């Protein structure tokens, strides 16, 4: 779908500004609107979302990011700058307000981290290295009786952001959170004042992981995260000073979209790719990207090992009609944070679809690798024959797989649980709603497999969109049950020993849950695609409390902020507080740029 120039001009922040602006519209319309604004390309942000981006973000994408090889290589540098400024409505180099030292709420003191070392925490993606997303009552600092008294404590605006999709962490009484602008912030949990900021230079989507390091001159603790360019950073948790940066995967197609997991002095880093979004273009040499996991020394950033999901490097296959070389096998992006099993000395992670046909056996699978060497211990394929590229819908190019799969992936982290009888399980949740229990002590042998909700009459899956009734970014687990939200709407619970459904509650008709679930005794927390944060009873899913985040907020740092969809991340709970980001300007979500903190009042 091509937007008429007049309509495009009316929507842009710089509409009618100058002849140069009109030229910018022309380049955008000619080169970009084939995907942006076309319903067939649901993963391409529509123009109204792009208009909220900073010029630096657009220019970065055209020069070094996802769009560099899709369309950026067809533009001159002047055209890239023109498009960046026209679509954003801002001039390049004018976005300085994101630095902490430009904010009015700088903390007046920065006490040693050890003073708050005993405060309860939420660290990393899943609160623990088993990724259960479950807090004890003591660590949560809340009970079910406290939930109706939750009130907004503070709101922090992420400057120039359109997505607050990086899940915060709360450690040492501080909230660490990343932004799609590339900034990392350390906030005081009690007041929201900002201790420091760090600019990675590229979008950060990962949760923050905090761990001890042995680095002279540091505080002894680092904040670890990855960025869109597949860089991994360690910054001092006390000062925000960069301790080291590493690039564990040399392939330029790689990126990091999930949090690294810290265990025993090592970081286990998941590696995904942007190639799935670009490779249907006929001029693209499809496909070479390989998902995987890398292990780094947490104190130095040195790579200890790298294991790819595809065991062999891609080989030349054939050339398309344009003479462009095609490659394979490829794919298997890792979109989730690895899970640690100290008993088996193993790391577990889920893999994405293949980007070439036929699909490799380790695509859409759970893999177990040895934590010391990266050697593959076992794998279990959840969905077979899932070869997928964005843009391979009704109209397909020669680059598209011979048989296009449903794009199911394993987006959520596999979760390691110990049942009441002492047995252990790796639980896997999937986009189409399948839930599997594997035995980690029997090389991933299947124990049970169920569907969380069953089919929905009249609601059909679409490529690249979570299947109705499915589970996207993960569930929460105690010793007895798994608690989850469904992408079609409704929340439920399954018995971990048998897979039997314990309850399924619609909660709110028509609301989709595309975020991760969080729980503590008596309470399950979930954000919705329309921006509502909900708390339901763990026993039956009945609604206890809700808060509408899709509105403007007065922020402690004076940044204009609004909420949007709550997706990809989940709420965190620790030390009497619930914290969540609101805004998800992709996949049809509502943009937003606010981090919200709640407490009992």
For the regions a language model picked out, list residue spans one by one:
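N-terminal export/targeting leaders of redox proteins
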Residues: 1-22, 89-114
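Sequence/structural segment immediately N-terminal to covalent heme-attachment motifs in c-type
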Residues: 16-38
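Solvent-exposed, polar/charged alpha-helical surfaces in well-ordered, non-transmembrane soluble domains
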Residues: 22-26, 30, 56, 60, ...
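Sec/Tat-exported extracytoplasmic proteins
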Residues: 31-32, 36-39, 62-66, 71, ...
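Axial heme c-ligation environment in periplasmic c-type cytochrome domains
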Residues: 40-51, 56-91
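Short, solvent-exposed loop/turn elements at domain surfaces
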Residues: 43-44, 129-136, 160-166, 185, ...
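Extracytoplasmic/lumenal domain signature
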Residues: 55, 144-159, 184-205, 210-219, ...
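Blade/loop signatures of beta-propeller domains
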Residues: 102-152, 309, 314
